[in-house]
Amino acid sequence: MVSVPFIYSCEGNDPQVKPEIAVRVNPVEATGGDQFMSVTASGNWSIAVKDQSGGPLSWVSVKPSSGYGSMSNVILTVEKNNGESARTAILELTADGNRTTVALTQQGTKESGGSEDVVVPEGCPDLRKVGWLEIPGIPEGTKLGHFSHSMTIGLVKTRNYSYSWDYDNYVAPWVAYPLSKWNIGNNIKRDDRDDPWAVDPYLSEKQQPVLYMRGFRSTSSRRYDRGHQLPSADRLYDYSSNDKTFYGTNITPQLSKLNQHFWAKLEGKVRSWAGSSDTCYVVTGCLTEGSTEYALDNVGKKITVPSHYYKAVLRYSRSTTLGFAGYMGCAILLEHRDYGNGSNFKEYAISIDELEKKTGIDFYPNLSKLIGKEAAAKVEAQDPKTINWWW
């Protein structure tokens, strides 16, 4: 795979640069589709698409096929491969009197598809065994996938976020992560123009939303944003940790009026809780049961629009007199709709126990190992509306 770790959309005349082509997704799924590729050059350039013998071919196209200076928004279009075998195209860049090539491979129908193709990179932990407080219970025989991304703070490698994956609806039923001043950070700033939307390397392009060219396309009059489950603003320690929040597996089609107002304020509220705690163990998720709506990703896949969103927060503070053994819990469950510009989160607050009943998910199963079953049960049963600290 030829990739670029961070691509800006600004073009220009780059003096004395080596001509290069960078393709984000290579090999390409049999289903084909569009993606951005980048060209690095300091003058006029052109791209020719050839087969392996140097002849023309028609199943790959590039637009524009010529230009001046570096560009990061060249559109590479690959048609669907109906054959069982893979096929290869040669992209030949001519610039500044030099030529360079990239071999683009498209998989055949025998090589693409299903959850059996999941490749978990070495070092991805077994979430049933890690014992992290934020990880929900994982039932035996589940059809969901479970993955975890890491980050490095200073010299310390730690977890960024973990998630379950619904291969049928193309969304994460839950995304779990620790939240504290330490891992939120405040070292970088993002501009909407340079948001690094990308596919998650744990899954094939066919198994997740492809959103790096543009946002969701609605099939109705409703407008959907690329809504984060782990917010980008929760990972501002460095670009590497923040980039991972833009993976398709962390994104759902979320109503713009919810994402940009009430939900954004709720995300800020959770960060404020973390800032006043040692650590908050957060689970953000969505429900798809009963949903009949979908939005289209950049290659036309139908991504289920969630019917509800929720947040579960387990707060720990060693110096608090609230809660039980330093822990207390709060959950918020929302229908997927417009809540206006308000911020009355208390109205939608419920206990962890109540959220478990609504979702069928066992939250914080590892808490009892730390503080005992009785204290853990009290944490999960506590009504957050009665605790002023949250509000």
State what each model feature region is.
Residues E11-P15, A22-Q52:
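Solvent-exposed, low-complexity, repeat-rich "mucin-like" stalks and linkers
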Residues G32-F36, M71-N73, R99-T101, N160:
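Intrinsic-disorder/low-complexity, polar/charged segments enriched in Ser/Thr/Lys/Arg/Asp/Glu/Gln
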Residues E11-D14, E92, L104-W391:
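Domain-level detector for secreted/extracellular nuclease and nuclease-toxin modules, and
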Residues V74-L76, E84-G97:
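A short beta-strand micro-motif common to beta-rich folds, especially ectodomain repeats
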Residues S42-I75:
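Surface-exposed binding patches on compact interaction domains or structured appendages
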Residues T31-M37, N82-I90, V156-T158:
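Short, solvent-exposed loop/turn segments enriched in Ser/Thr/Gly
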Residues F6-S9:
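C-terminal motif of bacterial Sec signal peptides marking the signal peptidase cleavage site
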